[in-house]
Amino acid sequence: MQPGRARPTPPPAQPEHASHGEGHCPGHGPTDPPPHVNWWHGLIGVNNEAAAKGGINALLWRYHNEQNPCDPKNEPPPFLASVLNFGLLALIVVRFGRKPIAEALKKRKQTITQELDNASRLKQEAELRLEEYEDKLTRLEETLAELKAEHAAQAEVEKAHVLAEAEQRRVRMRRDAEFRAEQELKAARAMLLQEAVQNAVVAAEELLRQRIGQQDLDRVNEDYLKAIPAAVSAGARRGAQTTGAAT
């Protein structure tokens, strides 16, 4: 249909549901050919009477039968209207939303950049902490090994010290036992010697009593009494000589 020419009034629509019996309109089934494309009819909306007049009305209005959705004269919204709507929306977005959108995109970019920087920093910090933990774990294992070696060495030293003390105690106890045994042996010998001497003296006295009479005892006493003055005189002379020599 050309603009400016009157569009004939369509005949009364006949229901198509009975003829097809498939539950859908022609052109909407999986095997039906696609419906025609409305490029520019009805930029404003639906008006069946105005659409039938042709001319500029065909540009502004399109036909659509509300009673019969399967009417072959029905026209979908024009493709040009979608293009115009999209262009108008793009113009509005560019005219009024370019700066806010640009700022939002810039802010979003800064936010993403900051988040990436934070993520990179957190990753580096995590790697550093991981290295620190690994170093601490390594040092901990080394420290445990050193402690085990130190404890083993200390145990050996303590063992040697205990054995040395036990040996010294054993030697000292043996020496003390030997000393006590020797002292007891000496005491026993002394007691035996004393007892033997006493027994010998008693035996000698008894023997002398048996062999020496009373006359012999009197003679010994007299000789002893006679020897006393001579001993006193000799002692006096030696004392005088000593005094003269000192003078």
UniProtKB/Swiss-Prot annotation:
The chain crosses the membrane at residues 79-97. One of its GO terms (cellular component) is proton-transporting ATP synthase complex. Residues 1-33 are annotated as: Disordered. Keywords: ATP synthesis, Cell inner membrane, Cell membrane, CF(0), Hydrogen ion transport, Ion transport, Membrane, Transmembrane, Transmembrane helix, Transport. GO terms for molecular function: proton-transporting ATP synthase activity, rotational mechanism. It is a single-pass membrane protein. It is found in: Cell inner membrane. Its main location: membrane. Belongs to the ATPase B chain family. F-type ATPases have 2 components, F(1) - the catalytic core - and F(0) - the membrane proton channel. F(1) has five subunits: alpha(3), beta(3), gamma(1), delta(1), epsilon(1). F(0) has three main subunits: a(1), b(2) and c(10-14). The alpha and beta chains form an alternating ring which encloses part of the gamma chain. F(1) is attached to F(0) by a central stalk formed by the gamma and epsilon chains, while a peripheral stalk is formed by the delta and b chains. F(1)F(0) ATP synthase produces ATP from ADP in the presence of a proton or sodium gradient. F-type ATPases consist of two structural domains, F(1) containing the extramembraneous catalytic core and F(0) containing the membrane proton channel, linked together by a central stalk and a peripheral stalk. During catalysis, ATP synthesis in the catalytic domain of F(1) is coupled via a rotary mechanism of the central stalk subunits to proton translocation. Component of the F(0) channel, it forms part of the peripheral stalk, linking F(1) to F(0). This is ATP synthase subunit b. It comes from Sorangium cellulosum (strain So ce56) (Polyangium cellulosum (strain So ce56)).
